Amino acid sequence: MVIVMYSIKMRASKNGKHISGAERIVNKDEIEETVKELVRRALTHENGTPDFINIKIEEIKEEITYINHLPIKTIHCKDKEEARETAKKILRNEGIPDSVIDYAYEIIDKGGMRGAAILNLKGERLEPDKERGVRVKNIDTTKELKEKILKENLGTERTVDAIAIASKVIHLGVIAELCTSDNKSYTTGYVATKKGYFRITNLKKEGESGGRVFFVKDDVDIEDLINKLENKPFIIK
């Protein structure tokens, strides 16, 4: 018997400014409880109380791809300078030029994007909408992975969401991802590559905005990549 699965997406904003977003892939029996959980998350976000919450529920028609999560490693850094240099080394090892990494930090420091910027190795921005960026959608983790991350202190609830994005992104051929949280008080960021998901403490200072950048090869088929990032359903185990 085929189990029908549903994608539930939440986004919340205030005065048109993005506050929070989240997504789950669940079966029919779990829809009601999941919607409650996502609404609660929207209403209690540290970035403020939204004046607009959108919940979208869709049956998933396409076959879901199940993949293993990237190995998780935490690197403790004493301050932002050390953290940024640590992230830079990991990205450099993937063949990304320093000038492109510096540009990625500029984009992240500016903040305000709901999705990710996409940079090739020449430093060209490839996402069609530079304000919105590209949203990685139709993703979730298994309950087992979520429990493992929280029980074994591999990370936080935010890590659970981020490992889903990072694992899908790298699986689809992105060279690396650099990310810091848009939660003002959360200063741990990460770099993801095919070698793993590297949580890096103090990648930004408290109160600073966050952002996300994907690094891709110069010959990438950008339309195909964006289509898969946004639409192809993945569950990370």
From Swiss-Prot:
Q: Give the protein's cofactors.
A: Mg(2+)
What pathway does the UniProt record associate with this protein? Answer: Metabolic intermediate metabolism; pimeloyl-CoA biosynthesis; pimeloyl-CoA from pimelate: step 1/1
Q: Where are the transmembrane segments?
A: none
Q: Name one GO molecular function term.
A: magnesium ion binding
| Known EC number | 6.2.1.14
Q: What does this protein do?
A: Catalyzes the transformation of pimelate into pimeloyl-CoA with concomitant hydrolysis of ATP to AMP.
Subunit structure, per the record?
Answer: Homodimer.
- Name this protein carries in UniProt: 6-carboxyhexanoate--CoA ligase
